[in-house]
Amino acid sequence: MHQLFRLVLGQKDLSRAGDLFSLDDSEIEDSLTEALEQIKIISSSSDYQTNNNDQAVVEICITRITTAIRETESIEKHAKALVGLWDSCLEHNLRPFGKDEDTPHAKIASDIMSCILQNYNRPPVMALAIPIAVKFLHRGNKELCRNMSNYLSLAAITKADLLADHTEVIVKSILQGNTMLLRVLPAVYEKQPQPINRHLTELLALMSQLEQPEQYHLLRLLHVAAKKKQLEVVQKCIPFLIGHLKDSTHNDIILNILIEIAVYEPVALNSFLPMLKEIGERFPYLTGQMARIYGAVGHVDEERARSCLTYLVSQLANMEHSFHHILLLEIKSITDTFSSILGPQSRDIFRMSNSFTAIAKLLTRQLENTKAGSGRRKISTEIEFPEKLEETKLIVTENEDHEKLQVKIQAFEDKINAGSNTPGSIRRYSLGQVSKEERKNIRFNRSKSLAFHTMLTKGVGSDDGEDENRGDIPASISLSEIDPLGQGNDKLPFKTDTERSQLGESSVSYPNIIHIDSENLSETVKENSQEETPETTASPIEYQDKLYLHLKKNLSKVKAYAMEIGKKIPVPDQCTIEDTVRSCVAKLFFTCSLKGHYCLYSKSSFILISQEPQPWIQIMFLFQQSLFPEPLSIQSHSVQFLRALWEKTQAGGAHSFETAMMESTFPQQKDLDQVQLHLEEVRFFDVFGFSETAGAWQCFMCNNPEKATVVNQDGQPLIEGKLKEKQVRWKFIKRWKTRYFTLAGNQLLFQKGKSKDDPDDCPIELSKVQSVKAVAKKRRDRSLPRAFEIFTDNKTYVFKAKDEKNAEEWLQCINVAVAQAKERESREVTTYL
């Protein structure tokens, strides 16, 4: 042991203790273990708790030792001696004397804990420390327990198996009020499920007492437990989960757990279907998840299949959500399993209808017919299914109030020669019998029918026609064949391509801001946009319509304005209004118009929550009018829908929709500035940009195809360089670390430096990133002018770039990579479905 250590510790000389800091770290590094053993002897003496001199000497020496260990990176060499001193503290009183007054041994334990457990990423050190660490959880010192819980949570992230043997102790600590340790349980459950299962009922009872993050970790635990497929756990979980579905904070996570259970134990959810239906009606954005649960239960037997189909079909006709493709897949899966429900014509139902509403009506009628035992296959007086394969054609008849869709069955089997009996040949022959105009506007393919209806009602069109002659249903209703903006690769959003003969490309495409009942809207698409006015045919009533007259007078200005503003502010594909405690908010969905090979938003959407819905509604109204050559009237279905949205947001005494649109046709500049500022704050422009060439808003990858091919090569980094990192969740870690980061693939990785403190491998998984934001201006000071944050489900990171420009580059690249990772997940889900 170094001479000065021997003097200070041997004689307990407080006057010389400060001189230890004048020594170089390397000079005393070999003496640290021996010094720790000497401190253990001093602190274990009977009079230590009352001897202030000894306490001061020990505190100074421990501070010097832990500093030297950190600077010389020799924690593994001295870990055994540190843990030995730490363990000796358990033999003494650790409860505080009074408020904020720790005992002498609690101070030692706290200092050593910080030194040891900051090395949570070093398994050899943790193997020695964790058995001792968990003992401190029950020693009555709340501050020590809280800090210990933080460190154990860190250890669980990197080395959960070391904590698994202590699961029982951890669970008991949680039940005694140390709920911070809930974040550890999902990590240790895989190794030690039984101790958690034994106390699961007690853990669930804590839910109402927990903070939101802790509730989330408890639900994560249930999700992990559900995957283990243990019946006892399922029986405890389901009533608890159903009971908390009304909480909008977590109902999305809860439904994911129920979906997991439904895969292997659907019968357990059968009795809860009425309650799930009620929740689905209350929260329409959960419809997609509800559909998967109903779909799973519907596979149990035919009786349950019929019951579940009734709900699924009713939701298929509902235009207040955007999950129709999932509903169709679940309906198709059930009817394929129990083919007797719809009979041999089930395939025709999915292929012959041009709208979700029409399909729903056909299915409803057929379900009623089969339930009543009717053997006839007549669906309605207007739509009838033949015994043999037949084709349809659309005949549009005009009414003075609206245009109505009729489907006429055209039998032609006897016209087919013996050499053309395949379904593909029959379709080609049928198309050859209709006029040139009909041939351009009609395709008897399921995906084209879906795209056709949705383009008029929700802005969804066909992407291509490569599977036009396929007969299998799953391929023809695949999401990959639907273009949410109804555009081909070279279409302009504000124009009609009159040269295209494809159904999805010959129509005017516009975003999904309007839900229109297909029965009240013509589905014939003319070749020329000047003829395409299904909503704007003038009637005598319209000439008394003030909104119609106002728009007629200002039509050219409205179109010019919409064209110009469309380059600065994107128009959402879908808009819903949701009530909050204080007011209404608009939930806006944006997708890419091109949907190229590496598109970031072909299957997913960028979702924006706006506290100011009315400017968005006004922007959508102007854009809607720009799509038609004639003025819209107040009776137009699109206007009716927008008016309904407006009324939901309308304050008492405020202007009605038509009055507001007439008095202030164009949004005020301050409102537009606020909209743009909000888009910037949520980093919208990192992942979207207006393409002058295409005349449409496209994602980063579609706007930069030359970068997309490079970025998507395996291992090719999107950006790399040095950043300073700080983990802010644990306030006691205050150091910034400069590391070399690489953003590539689905991860943000950093290069392990010379410091042994750096973990070997702890990348940030981009698919788990919830948001990426610049540090809010109100939080910025001179030390954080270029900082940004990354939020995951269980951690927050803060980074500093070399300057603000570099920070912006990192922000954009990370946002692009996160969108790419989530899009990849969406594609995998779609493929699975």
UniProtKB/Swiss-Prot annotation:
GO biological process: negative regulation of SMAD protein signal transduction; negative regulation of transforming growth factor beta receptor signaling pathway; regulation of signal transduction
CDD domains cross-referenced by the UniProt entry: PH_MELT_VEPH1
Keyword set, alphabetical order: Cell membrane, Membrane
A Pfam family matched in the record: PH
Gene Ontology cellular-component annotations: plasma membrane
Free-text note on domains in this protein's UniProt record: The PH domain is required for membrane targeting.
Protein name: Ventricular zone-expressed PH domain-containing protein homolog 1
Species of the source: Homo sapiens
Gene: VEPH1
